[in-house]
Swiss-Prot record:
One of its GO terms (molecular function) is orotidine-5'-phosphate decarboxylase activity. The keyword Lyase applies. Its EC number is 4.1.1.23. Belongs to the OMP decarboxylase family. Type 2 subfamily. The active site is at 97 (proton donor). It catalyses: orotidine 5'-phosphate + H(+) = UMP + CO2. Pathway: Pyrimidine metabolism; UMP biosynthesis via de novo pathway; UMP from orotate: step 2/2. This is Orotidine 5'-phosphate decarboxylase. GO terms for biological process: 'de novo' pyrimidine nucleobase biosynthetic process; 'de novo' UMP biosynthetic process. It is an enzyme of class 4 (lyase). SUPFAM superfamilies: Ribulose-phoshate binding barrel (SSF51366). Keywords: Decarboxylase, Lyase, Pyrimidine biosynthesis. It comes from Clostridium perfringens (strain SM101 / Type A).
Length: 287
């Protein structure tokens, strides 16, 4: 199961998930000047970040919107980035947040679990219900793939829907999490975690322990660290024995060179930030 590969990557390299949400204005001007087209520039920047952080991260999350916004040349960079990650045997999360049913969802599954855009995990939006998850299950069962489904997110607007009362003292996010956790038990790996994970933001620490205890077999993709205000202490509460999830950081890693005095090598700065993040979370877990 892909869940086992993720668990073992975390054990080896730590919980950091490097977010390749690469905006053109994140790229240093000196580096930009070397390229005549945006596709090559984006891919070359990503490649430098990947090489610098591969051995200090569990996986990479590639947010497709940053590439779609540039049209075909952006999608070419997206494709090349995924291909390079596969070449490096890195685990890939395609952050696509799809949420449809039936034939449409089958095509989304085919598009992102096969071919040019193949990834190990994708993100999904469950708003349409559990049948929006069904078309991905054959890939989870037979093709070593996985999904991270939105459960309780880190944005302020999460209060608008995710926190609505759903009866029996539960909120909407509780119901979503419980349904996914139950489904996920059909796809458990040898380490006790499922290939059906949840996106759980780290900016609401007061619910952390309860969620970790209830969603006992669900690996968490944890956004909100760094730029959104989440701390190592916040993150530690969502993990179990230092595992059971990965912690995404995008801007804080990609833009580390802007915050460091020795900022000539943006990739080396990204590596230093990833190591600092990994070590801070490890220290918080031990406290």
């Amino acid at each position: 199961m892909i869940a086992d590969k993720l668990f073992e990557k975390v054990e080896k390299n730590g919980v950091v998930c490097v977010g390749l949400d690469t905006s053109l204005d994140y790229i240093p001007e000196e580096f930009k000047s070397k390229f005549s087209n945006e596709s090559d520039m984006l891919f070359a920047f990503n490649k430098e970040i990947i090489d610098a952080t591969l051995d200090v991260s569990a996986c990479f999350k590639v947010q497709i919107a940053y590439y779609e916004a540039l049209g075909l040349k952006g999608l070419e960079a997206y494709k090349n980035t995924l291909s390079y990650l596969r070449e490096k045997n890195a685990l890939i999360i395609a952050d696509i947040k799809r949420g449809d049913i039936a034939a449409t969802a089958k095509m989304y599954a085919k598009a992102h679990f096969e071919g040019d855009f193949e990834s190990d995990f994708i993100t999904l939006n469950p708003y349409m219900g559990m049948d929006s998850i069904d078309p991905y299950l054959p890939y989870i069962e037979k093709n070593e793939k996985g999904v991270f489904v939105l459960v309780r997110t880190s944005n302020k607007g999460a209060q608008d829907i995710e926190y609505l009362e759903a009866g029996d003292g539960k909120k909407v996010y509780d119901v979503v999490g419980e349904k996914l956790n139950t489904l996920g038990k059909n796809y458990l790996g040898k380490h006790g975690y499922s290939s059906i994970g949840g996106v759980v933001g780290c900016t609401h620490q007061e619910e952390a322990k309860e969620m970790r205890d209830k969603l006992d077999t669900m690996p968490f993709l944890i956004p909100g660290y760094g730029a959104q205000g989440g701390t190592a202490k916040d993150v530690a509460s969502y993990l179990k024995n230092g595992n059971g999830g990965i912690v995404n950081s995008s801007r804080k890693i990609l833009l580390a060179y802007k915050a460091m005095e020795d900022n000539k090598n943006f990739a080396e700065c990204a590596r230093k930030e990833a190591i600092s993040m990994r070590d801070s979370i490890r220290e918080a877990i031990l406290k």
